[in-house]
Each structure stands twice: as structure tokens, then as C-alpha cells.
Amino acid sequence: LGVLLERELEDELTHSIEELPVECRTVFKKSRFEQKKYEEIALELGISINTVKYHIKNALSLLQKRLDNYLHLLIIYIFMDI
């Protein structure tokens, strides 16, 4: 069950990231997957650091809403595994 849930969550996260607005997704990926600093992202994309912060905040909010149902499944799984 754990592997199935993990795989499903990973697929849903990937799908959810791909559904983010383009610039939001680009900033999020550079921050989280490429481990770039906000200053680097801003310089690379020609946007302000505040715009980078806005996109990260927006991405996290959208992902949280999208993945909220999976949080409940993870909690149940954790308690089943104890």
C-alpha cells in the first residue's frame, strides 16, 4: 500500500506542478528542483525578487489546495504503519 500511495502522490504532484501557470511553474522549478536562489532566478528571468517570491507563494498555495486530499491519505497511512 505504501509504494502505491507514494507513486500516486508523486504522479499527482508532478501533474499539479505541470498545471501551474507557466511563469509560476518556471520559477517554482528553478527554486525547488534546481536549488537556485531567488536572486539568481530574478536575474535569469529578468524579473524582480518580489515577483519571484510572489510566484513561489502562489505555486505553494495552488499545490497545497490541489494536494489537500492526499494529505488525509498520508495521515491515515502513517497511522496504519505504526
Q: What are these language model-derived features?
A:
Residues 1-15:
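Acidic, proline/glycine-rich intrinsically disordered inter-domain spacer in sigma factors
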Residues 18, 22, 26, 34-51:
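Helix-turn-helix DNA-binding module
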Residues 60-82:
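C-terminal edge and immediately downstream basic/flexible tail or linker adjoining helix-turn-helix-like DNA-binding
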Residues 26-28, 47, 69-73:
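Glycine/proline-rich, flexible active-site/cofactor-binding loop segments
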Residues 11-21, 62-65:
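Short amphipathic alpha-helical boundary/capping segments
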Residues 44-68:
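DNA-recognition helix of helix-turn-helix
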